[in-house]
Amino acid sequence: MSSRSYKRVLLKLSGEALMGEDAFGINRSTIVRMTDEIAEVAALGVELAIVIGGGNIFRGVAPGAQGMDRATADYMGMMATIMNALALQDALKHKGVDTRVQSALNIDQVVEPYIRPKALRYLEEGKVVIFAAGTGNPFFTTDTAAALRGAEIGAEIVLKATKVDGIYSADPNKDPTATRYARISFDEAIVRRLEVMDATAFALCRDQKLPIKVFSINKFGALKRAVSGEDEGTLVHV
């Protein structure tokens, strides 16, 4: 049985998630599988917005950016997110999912600019909205963009798709005794020094009482289970 527990959600996808087993770029089979799951969630009637990163193409804090002006490197990273957003939109279109891309940087010939009322209208019409170019400002991560856009559109939860299936007491790759938290409060995560998002994004979600669910994008069906409110990943709550 499948049902939705949330009416409107913000999904944060890292650019690295699009690489699959590749070292760079977009892995075709990975994006096809990912969009299958997104389409399945959209079919439940969930109003879905997505913030996507660009780390599979370029990151402002990556070794390749060393020696560059940080703001310039960050703008390059923002443009990488636009490329990913267009690829994701194209893949969703082939699944019959009506999708719009809005960018925090103006490239009018390619994508429409981020306009909050239009984004809200698209969501209400059942369209998937992909937010590209982060916040449009250097020195802010796409995690922060996810928290910001989530708050702006009135999302009920931020779903952070990662390579691990939740938040653990220690690094599960290094400590075999590490245990996964099913639920944890914002304050407890701070006390335990657990890295959920970068500090700015985490503080924004906490201040806006916007819960975060961390789950694995590589686990089949995890997105649907997270949206359905099942015990999937880790829920960070107020």
Curated annotation (Swiss-Prot):
GO terms for cellular component: cytosol. This is Uridylate kinase. Homohexamer. Its EC number is 2.7.4.22. Signal peptide: none annotated. Pathway: Pyrimidine metabolism; CTP biosynthesis via de novo pathway; UDP from UMP (UMPK route): step 1/1. GO terms for molecular function: ATP binding; UMP kinase activity. Belongs to the UMP kinase family. Inhibited by UTP. It is an enzyme of class 2 (transferase). PANTHER family: URIDYLATE KINASE, URIDYLATE KINASE PUMPKIN, CHLOROPLASTIC. InterPro entries: AceGlu_kinase-like_sf, Asp/Glu/Uridylate_kinase, Uridylate_kinase, Uridylate_kinase_bac. Catalyzes the reversible phosphorylation of UMP to UDP. Its main location: cytoplasm. GO terms for biological process: 'de novo' CTP biosynthetic process; UDP biosynthetic process. SUPFAM superfamilies: Carbamate kinase-like (SSF53633). It comes from the Bacteria. Keywords: ATP-binding, Cytoplasm, Kinase, Nucleotide-binding, Pyrimidine biosynthesis, Transferase. UMP binds at G54, D74, T135, G136, N137, P138, F139, F140, T141, T142.
